[in-house]
């Protein structure tokens, strides 16, 4: 009885953990996402622009202590135009790499047109490709900008500057050189290079042919107009992100940055980190990001800001380097980088290693339990490259974990088998001391000690699943490698729920089942394996416990209907391995397997009920 209660409490606890976790992390934020969608649409429909669609420069740009320019309030209000029309406002240099395509506008020289060649909006290759960066003037401006700020230096490059280009294509191995003369003795040159993935290298040079020295501060920024529609999950950070030297990782949601004190000007809030060496700043989505990366050996000031212009929120992450003094007839240069692309784990790690970018791997939100999620991903990725299928990798990693935890599980199942072997003695003790609970418990403990039985050993197989379950869930949820990763048959995306539904006979009926009753094939398979696993043991003598155990497979089947298919496949496979393992151990210890008797008993009860009604 004690063991049955313990198992029941553990099962209920696990159910509550999963149910509450799912509500807190997934269903709870659904209303928040809807609210954000409305706000985002409103903001996009009223995005402020200047007459030519480019944000006006701040009147404080000349001050070396001012925030870097780029996205500032005060522009004349004008509705957004189509992305294509916004791109057509300026002559452009084409970007073409194996991973990216887009363009750089010669007006402002912003990197503001980037799409990802290898990623589509849906699993269909015919669906539109992912658009990451878009120009000012469009409905969703999102871009990177590089330049200089300074006092008493004359005109400096800004969003209205018309640059001259030495070519019409930016590609790997084919850098682009842009030049602009301010007419007062300063010649600005910008050399932009791009690799075959997602990294731009920007070298800004300034030549001083005037009679006076000038002091300039190099900057780079990533700017996003309007609050985007985020996933809204608490297990995932979306918003402003960066690593700021010894201050480490900084993550600010779109709401949080607006609650910071005033910074640098009217209608602007934010936070700055001064005298930082090593790091980066950017804006991240679930799968994509744009990040400005300064020279890792030179100090800089990093900042996160939110600026308000009418109904529009303008979010910006920026870095500003220390002062550079350029003497007459001298020149100076600074090199910065821009990451703009998909958060591929191995590529992010390679950039951190090869370019020496401080903690660039934190671009991916591994969470507090990174020591579980990272090894889980590495194992899945290893077998994926070996087998070519992430679904098969999940099955294989689950099998390896079963083998790894075999000693613990074996002791648990052996103890459970011994518990069943002494079931008659336990029943006798309960009958003998049914009126004295204290003596009953003492007799039970003596029996456990005599037979070397651990009454809570049966909890371990369940408890072991909890960290594995959440580690796999995190990997499926955050890593782009799992996005649109197929399994077999109808599973084309392991990171999405099983698309089939019993409510429309798995697609035979011409309607879509509502999400709250969506129940696919794999959740049903999982429920069946869980049902079989529970029928391996005799039914608890307590009717309440028996009902709880009877309904648990049904509850979990419906609950996991909205979980990622990869997670449901893991659970079903893990249940199957547990049944096989428990069956072998019970037979080895001479304990009767109750599965067939329990199944026959169900049918007999069903026949008796039918006969009674007849």
Swiss-Prot record:
One GO CC term, this protein: plasma membrane
Membrane topology designation: Multi-pass membrane protein
Skewed-composition ranges (Low complexity): 68-80
GO molecular function annotations of the record: membrane insertase activity
Biased composition (Polar residues): 36-49
GO terms of biological process kind: protein insertion into membrane; protein transport
UniProt key word Oxidoreductase: no
Compartmental location: Cell inner membrane
Residues spanning the membrane: 8-28, 386-406, 460-480, 505-525, 549-569
Pfam families linked to this entry: 60KD_IMP, YidC_periplas
Keywords: Cell inner membrane, Cell membrane, Chaperone, Membrane, Protein transport, Transmembrane, Transmembrane helix, Transport
Region (Disordered), start-end ranges: 35-80
Alphabetical list of NCBIfam families matching this protein: PRK01318.1-4, yidC_nterm, yidC_oxa1_cterm
Subunit and partners: Interacts with the Sec translocase complex via SecD. Specifically interacts with transmembrane segments of nascent integral membrane proteins during membrane integration.
Record family assignment: Belongs to the OXA1/ALB3/YidC family. Type 1 subfamily.
Function: Required for the insertion and/or proper folding and/or complex formation of integral membrane proteins into the membrane. Involved in integration of membrane proteins that insert both dependently and independently of the Sec translocase complex, as well as at least some lipoproteins. Aids folding of multispanning membrane proteins.
Protein's recorded name: Membrane protein insertase YidC
Lineage: Bacteria, Pseudomonadati, Pseudomonadota, Alphaproteobacteria, Hyphomicrobiales
Primary gene name: yidC
């Amino acid at each position: 009885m004690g063991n049955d209660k313990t198992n029941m409490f553990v099962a209920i606890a696990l159910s509550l953990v999963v149910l509450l976790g799912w509500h807190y992390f997934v269903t709870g934020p659904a209303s928040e996402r809807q609210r954000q969608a409305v706000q985002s649409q409103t903001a996009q429909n009223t995005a402020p622009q200047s007459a030519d669609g480019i944000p006006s420069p701040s009147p404080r740009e000349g001050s070396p202590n001012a925030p870097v320019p780029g996205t500032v309030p005060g522009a004349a209000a004008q509705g957004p135009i189509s992305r294509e029309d916004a791109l057509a406002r300026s002559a452009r240099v084409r970007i073409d790499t194996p991973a990216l395509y887009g363009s750089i506008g010669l007006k402002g020289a912003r990197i503001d047109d980037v799409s990802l060649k290898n990623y589509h909006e849906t699993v269909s290759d015919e669906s539109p490709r992912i658009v990451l960066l878009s120009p000012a003037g469009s409905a969703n401006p999102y871009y990177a900008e590089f330049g200089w700020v300074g006092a008493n230096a004359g005109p400096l490059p800004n969003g209205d500057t018309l640059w001259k280009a030495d070519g019409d294509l930016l590609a790997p191995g084919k850098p682009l050189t842009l030049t602009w003369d301010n007419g007062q003795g300063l010649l600005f040159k910008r050399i932009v290079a791009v690799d075959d993935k997602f990294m731009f290298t920007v070298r800004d040079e300034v030549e001083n042919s005037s009679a006076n020295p000038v002091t300039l501060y190099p900057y780079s920024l990533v700017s996003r107009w309007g609050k985007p529609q985020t996933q809204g999950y608490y297990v995932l950070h979306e918003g402003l992100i960066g690593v700021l030297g010894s201050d480490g990782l900084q993550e600010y949601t779109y709401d949080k940055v607006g609650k910071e004190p005033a910074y640098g000007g009217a209608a602007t809030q934010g936070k700055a980190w001064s005298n930082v060496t090593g790091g980066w700043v950017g804006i991240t989505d679930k799968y994509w990001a744009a990040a400005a990366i300064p020279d890792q050996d030179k100090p800089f000031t990093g900042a996160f800001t939110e600026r308000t212009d009418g109904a529009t929120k303008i979010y910006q992450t920026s870095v500003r380097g220390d002062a550079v003094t350029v003497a007459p007839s001298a020149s100076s240069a600074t090199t910065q980088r821009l990451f703009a692309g998909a958060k591929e784990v191995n590529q992010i790690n390679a950039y951190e290693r090869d370019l020496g970018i401080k903690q660039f791997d934190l671009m991916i939100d591994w969470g507090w339990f990174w020591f579980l999620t990272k090894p889980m991903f590495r194992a899945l990725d290893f077998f994926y490259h070996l087998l070519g299928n992430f679904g098969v990798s999940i099955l294989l990693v689950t099998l390896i974990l079963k083998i790894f935890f075999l000693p613990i599980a074996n002791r648990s199942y052996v103890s459970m088998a011994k518990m069943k072997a002494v079931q008659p003695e336990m029943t006798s003790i309960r009958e003998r001391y049914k009126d004295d609970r204290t003596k009953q418990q003492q007799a039970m403990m003596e029996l456990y000690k005599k037979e070397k039985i651990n009454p809570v050993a049966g909890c371990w197989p369940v408890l072991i699943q909890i960290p594995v379950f959440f580690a796999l869930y995190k990997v499926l949820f955050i890593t782009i490698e799992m996005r649109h990763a197929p399994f077999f048959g109808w599973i084309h995306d392991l990171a999405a729920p099983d698309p089939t539904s019993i409510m429309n006979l798995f697609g035979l009926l011409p309607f879509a089942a509502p999400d709250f009753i969506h129940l696919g094939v794999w959740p049903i398979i999982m429920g069946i394996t869980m049902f079989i696993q529970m029928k391996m043991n005799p039914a608890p003598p307590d009717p309440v416990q028996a009902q709880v155990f009877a309904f648990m497979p049904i509850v979990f089947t419906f609950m996991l209907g909205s979980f990622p298919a990869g997670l449901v496949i893991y659970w079903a496979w893990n249940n199957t391995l547990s049944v096989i393992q428990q069956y072998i151990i019970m037979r080895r210890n001479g304990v009767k397997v109750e599965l067939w008797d329990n199944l026959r008993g169900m049918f007999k009860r069903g026949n008796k009920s039918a006969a009674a009604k007849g």
